[in-house]
């Protein structure tokens, strides 16, 4: 069984030889940038550099996925947001204190949205990776959800205030922004993406689970209908209160944060959606060593998490030995339990 087959078997609940280790977001690091001579910000904006850096998840770490969209800002750049590109040891960001739009009437998709350098880089990178690894490993695209796009184009505070002051207008905004999600997602599918990650940051730090149900549940169900590949929803933070709703979306999996107990998460989704995660980034992968990483992997596996992954895009200075500890831990866990080839999640 190869990596792509393993990932799809886990998502579909079919028998597979071991739990897959995946990256729904990013495992790009400064160490891998040095190894490939592919540095931020250029590796976010040049397809060849992007593909070279992304492939290290598979070629150097033995992960079962390759995810070339490292950040969360490519389509926002194409929409005209004010960008801060930073250097190799820092993430590019949108200057959300300088929003480009004020309301739903302002939302316009530029004609060059998909030919813009920062969206085209991802589309072309996926094509490169698909030619290099046609059926060996799962290629994971990424398209921002409408809630995340709203933060970028309206600013976080104005957008969240609008959800209280004028919920109907908020829904109009999200419906229009959803079209960007579909447009960029479909372009990646057409280029060869096997799976899409959908980051939509309606996190418990900012909004309640009822907000998710009110504003996003139906939209996310519509995205599942529109986009023809399995979708992995990603939301940072404490999300237990919205997991029952997320389980109703039809998404293939939910990529969840380490702030959620994996046992509780498994109980909460009640078998209605697969879970990916939830190895801690700042405390464990960045600050501790391989033994601590393996302990967290075992905890997630013992809980029944189907796809093991860092909780989010990893810190750029994460050490390779800690990332290598993730697939090593899975191998050890399976070895302790004997045959795994009849496993069905």
Briefly describe each language-model feature range:
Residues 32-72:
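Segments that shape or occlude catalytic/ligand-binding pockets
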Residues 34-40, 100-104, 261, 280:
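Short, solvent-exposed coil/turn linker segments
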Residues 33-35, 79-81, 152-154:
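Short aromatic-enriched loop/helix-cap "lid" or pocket-rim segments at secondary-structure transitions
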Residues 3-26, 31, 64, 94, ...:
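Active-site loop segments of alpha/beta catalytic cores
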Residues 71-112, 136:
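A contiguous, low-structure linker/loop signature
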């Amino acid at each position: 069984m190869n990596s792509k087959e393993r990932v799809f078997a886990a998502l579909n609940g079919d028998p597979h030889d071991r739990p897959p280790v995946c990256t729904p977001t990013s495992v790009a690091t400064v160490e891998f940038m040095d190894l490939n001579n592919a540095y931020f910000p250029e590796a976010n904006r040049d397809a060849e550099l992007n593909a070279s850096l992304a492939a290290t998840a598979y070629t150097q770490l033995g992960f079962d996925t390759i995810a070339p969209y490292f950040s969360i800002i490519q389509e926002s750049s194409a929409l005209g947001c004010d960008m801060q590109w930073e250097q190799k040891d820092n993430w590019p960001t949108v200057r959300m204190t300088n929003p480009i739009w004020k309301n739903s009437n302002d939302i316009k998709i530029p004609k060059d949205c998909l030919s813009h350098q920062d969206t085209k880089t991802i589309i072309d990178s996926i094509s490169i990776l698909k030619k290099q690894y046609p059926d060996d490993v799962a290629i994971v695209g990424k398209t921002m959800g409408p809630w995340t796009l709203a933060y970028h184009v309206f600013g976080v505070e104005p957008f969240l205030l609008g959800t209280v002051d004028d919920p109907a207008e908020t829904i109009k905004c999200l419906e229009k922004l959803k079209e960007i999600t579909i447009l960029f997602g479909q372009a990646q599918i057409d280029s060869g993406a096997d799976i899409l990650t959908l980051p939509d940051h309606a996190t418990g730090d900012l909004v309640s689970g009822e907000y998710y149900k009110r504003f996003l549940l139906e939209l996310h169900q519509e995205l599942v209908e529109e986009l023809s590949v399995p979708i992995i929803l990603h939301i940072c933070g404490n999300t237990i209160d919205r997991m029952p709703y997320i389980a109703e979306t039809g998404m293939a999996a939910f990529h969840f944060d380490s702030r959620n107990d994996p046992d509780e998460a498994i109980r909460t989704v009640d078998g209605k959606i697969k879970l990916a995660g939830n190895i801690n980034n700042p405390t464990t992968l960045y600050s501790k060593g391989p033994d601590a990483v393996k302990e967290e992997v075992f905890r997630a596996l013992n809980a029944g998490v189907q796809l093991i992954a860092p909780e989010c895009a990893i810190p750029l200075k994460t050490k390779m030995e800690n990332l290598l500890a993730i697939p090593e831990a899975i191998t050890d866990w399976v070895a302790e339990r004997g045959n795994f080839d009849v496993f069905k999640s």
